[in-house]
Amino acid sequence: MGIAFFAGGCFWGIEAGFQKVPGVINTKVGYMGGHTIEPTYQEVCSDTTGHAETIALEYDDTAITYRKLLEIFFSLHNPTEVNRQGPDVGSQYRSVIFYTSPEQKEEAEMFIAEMNQSGRYHAAIATEVVPAETFWPAEEYHQSYFLKIGQRYGRSLF
């Protein structure tokens, strides 16, 4: 069993992108990387807490590798944008890999180096690689947001 934490724009889309991935057991959205204890969504959106909108993933490390999770994460957002993703602007939307072990740190740094050398992106990768801190779960209405909306409209959005 493994755990991974990623931030890359609005957490709704990142979570939805991982929810149907074989080997991903559970997802939860929340906040990490800031200085405010038990932040609320409104506080995080004020761009004063230092937190990033983050997804926590529990995964079966015998079914999916951390590298594969990194590949999926990079496919779900633009890792070259600084403090934004598309129309969403602010430090809460920054791209971050929060590692939980030296192995995750090394894997993330190697992956970013490979992506920078690949020419796949028009600019250098801006994704931060920093130690995981306290993960503060977001309010319940944010959890599995797109699955809830999709069900309301009778279809899944992802």
From Swiss-Prot:
Pfam family, one: PMSR
Gene Ontology biological process terms, A to Z: protein modification process
EC numbers: 1.8.4.11
SUPFAM superfamilies: Peptide methionine sulfoxide reductase
Keywords, ordered alphabetically: Oxidoreductase
Catalytic activity reported: L-methionyl-[protein] + [thioredoxin]-disulfide + H2O = L-methionyl-(S)-S-oxide-[protein] + [thioredoxin]-dithiol; [thioredoxin]-disulfide + L-methionine + H2O = L-methionine (S)-S-oxide + [thioredoxin]-dithiol
Entry keyword annotation includes Oxidoreductase: yes
GO molecular-function terms, A-Z: L-methionine:thioredoxin-disulfide S-oxidoreductase activity; peptide-methionine (S)-S-oxide reductase activity
Active site: residue positions: 10
Keyword Oxidoreductase part of the UniProt annotation: yes
InterPro entries: Met_Sox_Rdtase_MsrA_dom, Met_Sox_Rdtase_MsrA_sf
Transmembrane segments: none
EC class: oxidoreductase
Function: Has an important function as a repair enzyme for proteins that have been inactivated by oxidation. Catalyzes the reversible oxidation-reduction of methionine sulfoxide in proteins to methionine.
Family: Belongs to the MsrA Met sulfoxide reductase family.
Protein name as annotated: Peptide methionine sulfoxide reductase MsrA
Organism: Methanospirillum hungatei JF-1 (strain ATCC 27890 / DSM 864 / NBRC 100397 / JF-1)
Gene: msrA
